[in-house]
């Protein structure tokens, strides 16, 4: 979800003074995970000017010469072909953004004073695409062709981005699945304000609404409980116009294309409360408006100019003749508003989310409305939607132009109560003295709860609070537990940890870091698409989280490489150098967990920033050398074989790693078609993915027995052996575990060496040395008895064709 600092400021005005770093800390603390931050670079030599006069270019019909005032006593002439300058009555004395000579625009244009058809032009009148080309895909056709016209601005102001809200900060956040209300910034801002200890402002005015007209058609819900609410407002005699650039800028920052002021309003309010709105041309509606479930297949032309065939049980909004919307998903062209519309039906619904999910998936429609309706929406949010609608519309129209609600409804501010014991809360938080009742009550109130003595009333939009322990979790969002007086932890036990695996992995990390690779850590949870991408080991069916924090954090990843490429993608967007990076992590599958190492490189190793061609060349040989270092860290050598599958890697520039006839990894060049997913198709990127589990367990797969301390001296013998070519280490484990006269055993060394005895090469070159501990119990053995026991073990191993 995109979260605009400018939108938050509608509810927390003073947040504009808070550093972005502090806001990130606050969002993470309350449970909204920040994935990235986007800010916009400012441009020099921009200034606010005022259109003084416009006259046609004497030598070009499609050009105008504009006299622009840029200060009290300074005027310049600028030639422009913008279509909106031809209607002088609408633009004279309005404000424009002027790029003066020397301005370097993000689209690559450097502004110079120049002669155009015999007339001098001193600068450039800017369109939005000139200033923020990265967001040009969210511009309407009108805004793509025309320069920016501002109704209000300060003449000569050089901080021009604030008029377009380009001076915004956009936080890309993941929302917990238990908090669908947070898709409405109004609700998120309430808790953000509590954490930051800032004042929260309720936008909605409380003025009484009167003199509304009666809607002249019926709005009916004819489904069987498929909507919590279905209704709307009628607006009459209103001429559509362009929204202000303040509104357009906010919508563009949230990846929403501005259309006209009424449609833009229907897209702006859901940013606040997460309940979508749809606008119909009321004059195109025949008869009454009804919400129904489809009983037959029927086609309609949608607002995206595509034909869809509705399926049985799809939720439809219809009039007496036709389909006017696939409810909650997309409208029909049959009632689309256009420049001739003057009467409107503003539809507001709260539909069954399971049906919306099913229909949107079947028709493959991914609209903003469908995404919001696929989450749980409370009736309280629907109520707030109408309040915002009336508030904003009444700043544009008279009361008599608006109707009353087609269907009234009431919602309690709070929908359940929880009885609390403040001593229990303090005990659970671990602070019996630090937290007085009043502080707990104030904290809960700031979070949106109503507190009356030992009763806490839960807001109607919250469906995740069931008991007092849930309230403690809420308190932890805003209480700094680091200030609590620490309570000592008493423990009468010790835990012995097996650190062999960690030591091996730490040693590997140090080796790679010494080679200038950067060790990073990324999230284990991702989207289904990303979980299945670059799945070189072909793990089946990624593990799914039952209550994910968001759709992009729903599946356990099945490889590390995808996340590493996402890191490259992010660094590329910030124009950072792409350094070699790696990650070591345990990947969870339905068959268990396996340690993997993933590594990617996009540049020569050890190269200098001033000379990218320096250093060790990036190719398959280099990545092969890296893989040798990794495998040898565990005491093994590996062989390399060609790959047959070219789904992800370039077939003739990739290899698979094989140890003892078992594939443990892959190295090679990632295909451009895959890199395109990460905006990295112009790079040559080599990767490595090794399953370390077999390398780890081959030397750690032994039984550990912890016994009480006794006074007997440990009796051990070291045995060195080799295994036959056709068997693995499990054969030795089976033998030694069947010998019940040992207390434990461990591997103390592994090495490769030729054996003069094995002239036929029947045995593997790897030699293992194990230390065997005699099980003593309460008996003291003589040297002869000890030798007899270990001779028994050796004879047993020989019977299993283990070479001693």
UniProtKB/Swiss-Prot annotation:
Residues 710-804 form the FDX-ACB domain. It catalyses: tRNA(Phe) + L-phenylalanine + ATP = L-phenylalanyl-tRNA(Phe) + AMP + diphosphate + H(+). Residues 413-486 form the B5 domain. It is an enzyme of class 6 (ligase). One of its GO terms (biological process) is phenylalanyl-tRNA aminoacylation. It comes from the Bacteria. Keywords: Aminoacyl-tRNA synthetase, ATP-binding, Cytoplasm, Ligase, Magnesium, Metal-binding, Nucleotide-binding, Protein biosynthesis, RNA-binding, tRNA-binding. Binds 2 magnesium ions per tetramer. One of its GO terms (molecular function) is tRNA binding. It holds the Pfam family FDX-ACB. Mg(2+) binds at residues 464, 470, 473-474. GO terms for cellular component: phenylalanine-tRNA ligase complex. Transmembrane segments: none annotated. Its cofactor is Mg(2+). It is found in: Cytoplasm. Belongs to the phenylalanyl-tRNA synthetase beta subunit family. Type 1 subfamily. HAMAP family: Phe_tRNA_synth_beta1. This is Phenylalanine--tRNA ligase beta subunit. The gene is pheT.
